[in-house]
């Protein structure tokens, strides 16, 4: 059992040296939580048109000071912000309506809100409130200052210790068990979406691609920014109305081939993550492992085709370094079985839990969250040092421009009060066109505002 005490160093220090000196008698002191696996909480019935929100007080944009960009994804950006009144630090996910409508992902945004609003547990990031303006949608969520697993992996120079890997993977399995028991398939599981809270526990985030209880769903679905057109691997012809959801590295072959998929998609992604943690890079890349860890461009269709070809031609033969234990290799190979019907986890989570890789795991204490990844130590509530900045976030001028534009847009527009106030909407569009010269307010975004009158975003409106 890999148990860590609260003396774990900050990212500013060397993780590798610390873990090499851990003694077997280390213990932790963390609060005990009721196991949601053994005792399932009551939840509201789910529906596509659910209108309840998780906060009785709707929080308008003007209530927050936006501090910096935490991350950027296919749907939008996540900002670190502070409530002006309560001084509470939160993470605010901002989504452009124009992108959502163009990509026909309105239902997916509503599904994400439904999941975050109705499932309150220790394994999912908490949603405080949600609202919309004429151009954007906002999720006000808890800020998890322990960072994400992508940052954690990079802090180890892409060589995470096996004991720590086992600890994290076990916590992810408990999270997936909770989701699958409630009929939720995440569909975008990757290190960036696996967060660490202030108590050192794993929480899953970003449910923008999630679905409820689907089996063999049609592949005639739309796409996010960093997802790519489905193609026939035999003739490389694209099919315009067939799209793939997800991030290229983590997509299973049945999705690429349009064969339909179910909960085993999450187990495939877990196998990719396990490989990445232990070896330092995903198993299917456009370059050889020694040449490049990350793709030259996530949006380079040629590179994505190479990745997809490798995934669909996968025959259980992967590169493994000699240092890797056979039991870890066996787990990876079974999670990455190209046949989803025999893939580990196809018959339920117990298949995964019973694998010899987890022979020393006491699942009960993981369900009760008695095991930490590590104990974050932060200087203040706004400390983001556990998040390693991505390249696109390093430009401070760009970050300031983004935040200034977000606030400027809010101040310049007279936010409409209801969907029937058409004249006010048109006036707001004119004000925005005259006052905002930022790339955020491009022609597509301005031209699509009138369509919002006919789009049912399940968000409180201002």
From Swiss-Prot:
Residues 64-358 form the Protein kinase domain. It is an enzyme of class 2 (transferase). It catalyses: L-seryl-[protein] + ATP = O-phospho-L-seryl-[protein] + ADP + H(+); L-threonyl-[protein] + ATP = O-phospho-L-threonyl-[protein] + ADP + H(+). GO terms for biological process: intracellular signal transduction. CDD domains: STKc_MAST_like (cd05579). The active site is at residue 188. One of its GO terms (molecular function) is protein serine kinase activity. Its EC number is 2.7.11.1. InterPro entries: Kinase-like_dom_sf, Prot_kinase_dom, Ser/Thr_kinase_AS, Ser_Thr_kinase_AGC. Keywords: ATP-binding, Kinase, Nucleotide-binding, Serine/threonine-protein kinase, Transferase. Residues 414-439 have a biased composition (Low complexity). Belongs to the protein kinase superfamily. AGC Ser/Thr protein kinase family. This is Probable serine/threonine-protein kinase DDB_G0286841.
């Amino acid at each position: 059992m890999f148990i860590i005490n609260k003396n774990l160093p900050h990212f500013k220090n060397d993780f590798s040296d610390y873990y090499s000196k851990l003694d077997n008698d280390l213990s932790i002191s963390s609060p005990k939580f009721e196991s949601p696996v053994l005792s399932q909480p009551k939840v509201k019935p789910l529906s596509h048109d659910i209108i309840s929100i998780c906060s009785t007080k709707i929080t308008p944009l003007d209530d927050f000071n936006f501090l910096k960009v935490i991350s950027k994804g296919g749907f939008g950006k996540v900002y670190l912000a502070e409530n002006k009144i309560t001084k509470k630090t939160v993470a605010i996910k901002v989504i452009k309506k124009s992108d959502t409508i163009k990509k026909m992902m309105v239902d997916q945004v509503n599904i994400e809100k439904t999941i975050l609003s109705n499932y309150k547990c220790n394994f999912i990031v908490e949603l405080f409130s949600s609202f919309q303006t004429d151009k954007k949608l906002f999720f006000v969520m808890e800020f998890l200052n322990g960072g994400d697993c992508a940052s954690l992996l990079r802090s180890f120079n892409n060589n995470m210790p096996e004991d720590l890997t086992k600890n994290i993977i076990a916590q992810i399995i408990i999270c997936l068990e909770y989701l699958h028991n409630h009929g939720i398939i995440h569909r975008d599981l990757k290190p960036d979406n696996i967060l660490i809270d202030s108590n050192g526990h794993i929480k899953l985030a970003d449910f923008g691609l999630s679905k409820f209880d689907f089996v063999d769903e049609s592949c005639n679905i739309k796409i996010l920014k960093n997802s790519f057109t489905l193609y026939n691997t035999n003739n490389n012809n694209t099919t315009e109305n067939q799209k793939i959801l997800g991030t290229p590295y983590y997509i299973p072959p049945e999705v690429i081939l349009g064969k339909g998929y179910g909960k085993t998609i999450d187990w495939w992604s877990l196998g990719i993550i396990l490989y990445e943690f232990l070896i330092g890079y995903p198993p299917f890349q456009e370059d050889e492992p020694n040449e490049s860890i990350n793709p030259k461009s996530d949006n380079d269709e040629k590179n994505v085709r190479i990745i997809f070809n490798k995934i669909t031609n996968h025959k259980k033969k992967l590169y493994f370094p000699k240092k890797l234990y056979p039991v870890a290799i066996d787990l990876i190979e079974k999670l990455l079985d190209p046949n989803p019907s025999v893939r580990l986890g196809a018959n339920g989570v117990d298949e995964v839990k019973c694998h010899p890789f987890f022979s020393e795991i006491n699942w009960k204490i993981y369900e009760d969250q008695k095991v930490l990844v590590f104990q974050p130590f932060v200087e203040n509530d706004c400390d983001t040092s556990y998040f390693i900045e991505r390249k696109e976030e390093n430009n401070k001028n760009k970050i300031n421009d983004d935040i200034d534009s977000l606030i400027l847009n809010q101040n310049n527009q007279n936010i409409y009060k209801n969907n029937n106030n058409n004249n006010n909407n048109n006036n707001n569009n004119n004000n925005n066109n005259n006052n905002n010269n930022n790339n955020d307010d491009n022609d597509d975004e301005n031209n699509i505002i009138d369509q919002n009158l006919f789009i049912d975003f399940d968000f409180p409106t201002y």
